């Protein structure tokens, strides 16, 4: 018994000793604090560091308004919407905090100890929570109403019931192969100048562009089969399924260096180094480049996620839904959707431009403040008056062809909505909106999978990698993959023509109608002032795309003049693509060939056969020196085409695999039984891109297949002969035979009708910024509705202390359905709409004070001047000869120099000395 007691006491003492030693060790590693306070302080310090870098970026951007440098335009095109920005900021705070834990651990110990060995799982989760990442890592709450099977959520969440985050916006891009970071976790390929691949350094991306990719504008070959619309649709549909935001900061987190100026790799700055025999504008030795934002719970944050290890690599975020769902039209977040809808309409319409019309048709609305005025102003107008267009994707104003497609689909939604309301007067505005949105999404799917992708892959590869539709498969993850978004689908950049062709009503060119691409970047005023959408559409239909030829990959409008609106610099799209692949840690070309079941290329002969061009193989191997080192985007781009295709075997495999996943993993795919009726599916299949153009533009003739280049007029058909949908398939009889009818409209909300167990059900929702008070759904019973409808009450976001809508630098003012962040003069609201920044100007009160002071000083000076001059005049008068005053006709009156009179040349020089003496000094008088 005594021995047991002694043993028990010994074990207790040992455990207590180990426990307190563990506490002391953790306290020491966190800089002397206990776990909780140490972690909280560390996260707060990381938040301050990240926010200061973001604040510095916004301050610099404000001071550069009106200076349209290419890097600034690129930044605007990659500007995330607020929900994505919040997720990106949280990921950066989280990663910065964990990097600091790692640094402290390594500094105090010789071993490469992991944060998971130092902090408890509870405190690791605390870091995720304090940084703001946790909400972006948890599964969303999915609705269980009868609408769950009728309409997709705007965020794409809950499409898959078992994996509700699959395909949702603001989640990580999928990885089909493990990434190849230089430290295994986060550092891009090419980050460390002395890091070797197969014993060799990677070539600078700018040198790859110059030697392999670049071709002059005059040397391009045109596609004899496909129209420029094929290229434009590829860009448009890419913007429907993928958007990887750049870091929210353009200043280094450590030290605040400006990423537009520094040539050092200091996250998030990852500049493109220029060859030693070349320099950029003003002698620059690099081009600016910013890393893509990490997704929450990846990279050095991986240790903080339950089932992930420390080695979980950095992932990149997709700010859009992965699905082909027309997010280009409707957005990918509730806040964005709210900005796009016309809430005063009973027809479920989208907002249109209220200042400009296109021959009676709608233009896209302008983006409201505080969006930066990044679009180029019309010549002769102030730079501050150059808003970009507002659409579901922030890149809608990049080039006229892209803007034209956004405009077409805005008009198509409103056309369908008006027709549906005319057919079904009993439909609520929300029902009309959702039904039109559902049809527009289906048309995006049809045009892409039926008409576009087979032309890109070729019939054989399409059958192999995509094949016929077999129905929805809940085991298929539809999430857009990193290699698809960052490499394979960027093949389209090699099909961009250096000219924007605009044609008149007879499809003829005229002087000044064509624009070099550099004169069209971010210039929406050209559509407003130079003929509207129709001339651009005619050019897309009747002029060929550029053909992707191995030794003519990208023209100089993209490699030398990307986003160039002035002489303030340049960017190179080819180098950006290569650098982005390295930033994302994409494995090399051979790894992806093996992934697709293709043979690895080991020799020059192998590469020469794959490209069908020995000269190109020479150039590539001359730079990379080993086939395994070739960047996947370049390798896939250089492959010779498959039969009837516009890609080689590698990109055909990756694009086909992705498109099949987008189709088979989408519960709301248009062909999935139950999404549409059989009659509706039949009508949808009759529609085409040509019909959309006929219905929403001034064109009276179009090709039957809008993606095949047509010769005017013999290969164009009148719009009357282009078949389309009969919307009668969407006619519904109004409910009858019950005691319910329809309730009164809900202010700041709406309702949708569906059936549940044979009973009519109304499901209510509120606009963004409002909260339901009352039941979310009511059911029709024999005695009427089982409950009165709910109310929509405004949410006071300013009371949210866990996730405040405004930065601490701003005052929060609640508004109906939203919030307004206000700044005290001289601070102004930054581009994020929540932070006050210094614009580098004096306060308005100071300006007024200075102006009043200047007036006072001038007044006093004038008074003093008057006194001096009167005194001078009085002293000088006795020196005048008697009888020679004014009006005697003998002598002109003498001027008083400097006292307000006009000096007459040659007047009484003998009296100058006396006048000077009486004034006191010539300087005073003058």
Curated annotation (Swiss-Prot):
It catalyses: 2 iodide + H2O2 + 2 H(+) = diiodine + 2 H2O; [thyroglobulin]-L-tyrosine + iodide + H2O2 + H(+) = [thyroglobulin]-3-iodo-L-tyrosine + 2 H2O; [thyroglobulin]-3-iodo-L-tyrosine + iodide + H2O2 + H(+) = [thyroglobulin]-3,5-diiodo-L-tyrosine + 2 H2O; 2 [thyroglobulin]-3,5-diiodo-L-tyrosine + H2O2 = [thyroglobulin]-L-thyroxine + [thyroglobulin]-dehydroalanine + 2 H2O. The record marks 395 as: Transition state stabilizer. Residues 738-793 form the Sushi domain. It is found in: Membrane. The chain crosses the membrane at residues 845-869. Belongs to the peroxidase family. XPO subfamily. This is Thyroid peroxidase. It comes from Sus scrofa (Pig).
